[in-house]
Amino acid sequence: MTQLYTYIRLLGACLFIISHVQGQNLDSMLHGTGMKSDVDQKKPENGVTLAPEDTLPFLKCYCSGHCPDDAINNTCITNGHCFAIIEEDDQGETTLTSGCMKYEGSDFQCKDSPKAQLRRTIECCRTNLCNQYLQPTLPPVVIGPFFDGSVRWLAVLISMAVCIVAMIVFSSCFCYKHYCKSISSRGRYNRDLEQDEAFIPVGESLKDLIDQSQSSGSGSGLPLLVQRTIAKQIQMVRQVGKGRYGEVWMGKWRGEKVAVKVFFTTEEASWFRETEIYQTVLMRHENILGFIAADIKGTGSWTQLYLITDYHENGSLYDFLKCATLDTRALLKLAYSAACGLCHLHTEIYGTQGKPAIAHRDLKSKNILIKKNGSCCIADLGLAVKFNSDTNEVDIPLNTRVGTRRYMAPEVLDESLSKNHFQPYIMADIYSFGLIIWEMARRCITGGIVEEYQLPYYNMVPSDPSYEDMREVVCVKRLRPIVSNRWNSDECLRAVLKLMSECWAHNPASRLTALRIKKTLAKMVESQDVKI
């Protein structure tokens, strides 16, 4: 690098000298002589040979603009040539000058070739005062090629070449350094992976690891090192879903299927919050999506936020209801299991390792998954809020994301919800849960009749409703999803209708609690002899 800087400095010095030579005027190139007489001409001595310029006769020339200091009547004496020259300056003005030219170099000067950047013409003669009547004319304007052979363009070309070479050198050094760093990181990653694989004994299943963590750990999930190990060893199989937060993939860990939620980097707040909620002490419940691990994967150039959970091949309640119908037992099993999960979220567990009360804030059929046994589990806790009863504080996530407008409670839509108290968040969840029960009930067959699957308010608002659309329907008109007349003729659906109506009441204080919903559905399950 020092050699490069030295070369650039030398180049700068050369360019300075070149520009200095180019900047000299014609007075330094076309040297005239002073006044001389014929007697001043040298005579050859015996045995002495004179130079050619000393044998030439002297001429008297007319001078204008190039006169020596001892010129008389604008004349000068030379043994070379008389000349006249016309030049054009930078402003486009022409000047005609004349004078005497020394013998040395006169042949070269008289053959002066025009330059693209300086228009001029010189004419020479060799008789007394012959240049007084010379009228040289400027050469025509010629737009020459970029490389016209001039020193100035040569300097520019050299400078450009030096800059390009320097850029190539710097780029090569940077790329090589980055490549070495990448190779080093990859090697370190592979070594860590090998060490982590040895950390989890062969034959240990996810269920074994989770059971061990619950019995001997803090109750907040697997140790972080184990989570990172599992995340590194996941094999992605296929994408099964995509949403506003990111993508969901079906992956495998040692042959076991897992769901991998890959968050967009812009949704880091949601990833962090959901990971934090899942790792809350005593959070694990059969009707809450089973959390396995979370990790940030990537190198310096890319980052992936992983959330690894149990995989449920039946998909979401939304997907399930679109293609499947229910009998009363299946309906009650879905509703009751979902209520159990919501009740666990809302309930605070006291003790040395207690669990805070949690409100979901984005309950909808797409955020409830269907397990193999036909029960539900609640997922997507990226917007959840926690309540700390010791400090009486509501822990609200620092997240720009908001819930789904179609499922928002009236107090959320009209912005009357008190954000500093926890109970309003609980009641907003209950409103959303009532809409989910409505979605389930529509797909329940009674008397051979069933409605097609629809989202709540499907016939009242657009497919992607705005706040204003929902506020007009829910808050101003106080409308609720339509109910089929057949519901009143069936004992089970009639009870479900009463339940959902008490869930979506306009006044939050009039709504049922999750515990009351759970107990009511438990009685219905018992009366129908449903096996949970």
UniProtKB/Swiss-Prot annotation:
GO molecular function: ATP binding; BMP binding; BMP receptor activity; metal ion binding; protein homodimerization activity; protein serine/threonine kinase activity; SMAD binding; transforming growth factor beta receptor activity, type I
Topological domain ranges for the Extracellular compartment: 24-152
Annotated keywords: ATP-binding, Cell membrane, Disulfide bond, Glycoprotein, Kinase, Magnesium, Manganese, Membrane, Metal-binding, Nucleotide-binding, Receptor, Serine/threonine-protein kinase, Signal, Transferase, Transmembrane, Transmembrane helix
E.C. number: 2.7.11.30
Listed transmembrane segments: 153-176
Region annotation (Mediates specificity for BMP ligand) ranges: 107-109
Cytoplasmic topological intervals: 177-532
UniProt: ATP binding residues: 240-248, 261
Catalytic activity line of the entry: L-threonyl-[receptor-protein] + ATP = O-phospho-L-threonyl-[receptor-protein] + ADP + H(+); L-seryl-[receptor-protein] + ATP = O-phospho-L-seryl-[receptor-protein] + ADP + H(+)
UniProt-annotated catalytic positions: 362 (proton acceptor)
Residues annotated as domain GS: 204-233
Segment forming the signal sequence: 1-23
Subunit composition and interactions: Interacts with low affinity with GDF5; positively regulates chondrocyte differentiation. Interacts with BMP4. Interacts with SCUBE3. Interacts with TSC22D1/TSC-22. Interacts with BMP2; the interaction may induce HAMP expression. Interacts with BMP6. Interacts with heterodimers composed of BMP2 and BMP6 in vitro; the interaction may induce HAMP expression.
Family designation: Belongs to the protein kinase superfamily. TKL Ser/Thr protein kinase family. TGFB receptor subfamily.
Protein name, as recorded: Bone morphogenetic protein receptor type-1A
Source organism of this protein record: Rattus norvegicus (Rat)
